[in-house]
Amino acid sequence: MSRYRGPRVRIIRRLGTLPGLTNKTSQLKSSSINQSISNKKISQYRIRLEEKQKLRFHYGITERQLLNYVRIARKAKGSTGEVLLQLLEMRSDNVIFRLGMAPTIPGARQLVNHRHILVNDCIVDIPSYRCKPQDFITIKNQRKSETMISKNIELYQKSKIPNHLTYSSLEKKGLVNQILDRESIGLKINELLVVEYYSRQA
């Protein structure tokens, strides 16, 4: 299944707020759930499916990519669900988004694809590149890159940067301090339901 490129508001009306997909919010989710519950009992499969879809649309990845991340998480030590979230959160496009250098993950992915971003002084043009503790993220030394990202930071770096990241406005540099903990996830999600959804595939 390819990456979704359709109307984003339609998705958040169905799944609720997804800050990685769009900075718009929807007030329709809770009422639609209540009406659905009153009409018929929601199946466990649908509940798991919706949690999986939240994860996929928030991080902007394909079905195949998400399944691969689940398989990697199953082989790692620790809670499969927590490891899965850590893998997704440490993607370069998500790190750039969480630093406030882009308004959304699709916006961050575009910065990476267009070679505006450096990790440890090397251009990274692969959005799925996995950042590691002590990696530092900087802007390509070109006026266009600096102007674009500085404007994004001014507009979108409003919320608190999560504890596993820091950003220096003076140096225009982001730093990955550590692997993030569960409390720092920027999405309301029940990752165990996602793991259960893939239990027969991963």
From Swiss-Prot:
The keyword Transmembrane helix does not apply. Its main location: plastid. SMART domains: Ribosomal_S4, S4. GO terms for cellular component: chloroplast; small ribosomal subunit. It is found in: Plastid, Chloroplast. It comes from the Eukaryota. Residues 90-158 form the S4 RNA-binding domain. InterPro entries: Ribosomal_uS4, Ribosomal_uS4_bac-type, Ribosomal_uS4_N, S4_RNA-bd, S4_RNA-bd_sf. Pfam families: Ribosomal_S4, S4. GO terms for molecular function: rRNA binding; structural constituent of ribosome. GO terms for biological process: ribosomal small subunit biogenesis; translation. Keywords: Chloroplast, Plastid, Ribonucleoprotein, Ribosomal protein, RNA-binding, rRNA-binding. Belongs to the universal ribosomal protein uS4 family. One of the primary rRNA binding proteins, it binds directly to 16S rRNA where it nucleates assembly of the body of the 30S subunit. With S5 and S12 plays an important role in translational accuracy. HAMAP family: Ribosomal_uS4_B. Part of the 30S ribosomal subunit. Contacts protein S5. The interaction surface between S4 and S5 is involved in control of translational fidelity. This is Small ribosomal subunit protein uS4c. It comes from Exsertotheca crispa (Moss). The lineage of its organism: Eukaryota, Viridiplantae, Streptophyta, Embryophyta, Bryophyta.
